Every structure is written in C-alpha cells, then in structure tokens.
Design a protein with these regions (language model features):
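N-terminal intrinsically disordered, cationic/polar leader segments
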Residues: 1-90
Length: 90
C-alpha cells in the first residue's frame, strides 16, 4: 500500500496547534476546530503568530515532520525539522 504524505495548512491567525495522543489538534480561542492524525502528515505550515505546543514540536521532530511558520501575509519566519540521518559531510 502506498503511503500518501500530506501537508496541513493552518491559515487562521488565532489558531494554536497542540498534541492529543497521536493527533494534531487545532484550537481557536480555546475551542477545538480540527483534528488530524500525526502519522498522515509530512509537514505542517502555520500562518500567524499564535504558536505550537512543545509536545507537538517534540513529536514532529521524532517523526521527521517539518513545521514551518509564516506571517499572516506569507513571509517566512522559521522552519523546524527533525534529526538529519546519514552522512552529513557529503
């Protein structure tokens, strides 16, 4: 079976990303508005300044899921990835 890896785009400026078990949970003003299984994701792109829980960052780093933060207008702020595997000196 072929594994399709998807990217989660969070475009709401007031959204906060958290971890519940093996799920990414999107909160907006302390209300849950979405839930996605972590094993289906290759990357998460967040537009806005609210942030992500440290538990979700750690889980994404362990599973090699990239987190990318952009301003509400789309300007790049930061990218977080997991450990590099293999020979990095090449």
């Amino acid at each position: 079976m072929r594994k399709l890896l998807n990217t989660l785009y969070v475009t709401s400026e007031n959204s906060y990303l958290g971890l519940d078990g093996e799920n990414v949970v999107v909160y907006d003003d302390k209300k849950e508005i979405g839930r996605v299984p972590l094993h289906n994701l290759e990357g998460i792109v967040s537009f806005g300044y609210r942030g992500t829980s440290s538990a979700l960052m750690g889980a994404c780093a362990d599973k090699n899921i990239s987190l990318c933060y952009l301003t509400p207008q789309g300007k790049f702020l930061a990218r977080i990835t997991g450990k590099i595997k293999g020979n990095v000196i090449l």
